[in-house]
Amino acid sequence: MRIPPSAQSSILAAFLTLTPLFGQSGKATVDNGTWLFIDTTDIPASRQHLNHEALFSKYVEGYNRQVLKAIDIVQAHAMDGGGYFTGMHAKPTESPIGYKLTLFGKPLLDPPRTTSYCSGSSYGVFIEALNLLLPEGSSRLSEERYESLRMQEPDGSRREDRIKFWGKWNDDGWGTHYAMVQYSGIGEEIPPERARPGDFMNIAWVKGLGHSVVFLGWFVKKNQPGMVFWSSQKSTNGYGDLVLWPLTSVKSVKTVRMTHPERIFSFDVLREVVRELPGDTVAPPNR
């Protein structure tokens, strides 16, 4: 169901109070360098739920736990998914995310619609994770970096792809890599075998363009690998979990882990990025 705007703040406040915050030790998530396959019983039957932290945090420590909690925060705004829509020339134009997203209390977007699309939803999780990790960040965020993170121009018009932080995240190709690794240094590239719940991922399809998601895990079914992730897509009516099995539709991926959230206060807003990068083939070992 859709949560009325008047009730969202009280529901989210209660959710944040009642749900314990894991991984407060202030460290990046680490892994052992090998494939991790989650238990298929941890994959919920419901596409929309608020159990990402509860279900998947047992597989990780550190910052990825806050990312998982951030998924629940975004999802709580629209338990029916909120709707999926793309159309930059539509009137009103597309909305990256369907609610008034803020960073440290500073508005990033006045949404023209209540719908969302993939890169907007993953960016929302990134921002909400920063709110959890750096609760006193408002006084440390410079105006030029705040402006770079905004999802609209000052006049409310659409911020174009490749422009500043959000424009790089929203770019075709490996947007999370452009924004988190190259542009800001907030993240680190991770090969597929090291991917863990709470990592950010761009997927290139065999047919079609790509998808920006928050990775939840690899799994094996009938001796074939699959993956589960959270994003906004048409098949889930916006925000929701998607189970992909088998992986025959995936051409390649690019995975990024949040490792230095504090660099949100120091990145160079004029830094350029390299867009032409090869993707990583997903080839788990036979099990």
Predicted regions and their residues:
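Bacterial N-terminal signal peptides that target proteins for export
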Residues: M1-I11
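...with weaker cross-activation on analogous glycine-rich loops/strands in unrelated enzymes
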Residues: E143-N237
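Low-complexity, Gly/Ser/Thr/Pro-rich intrinsically disordered linker/tail segments
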Residues: P225-R287
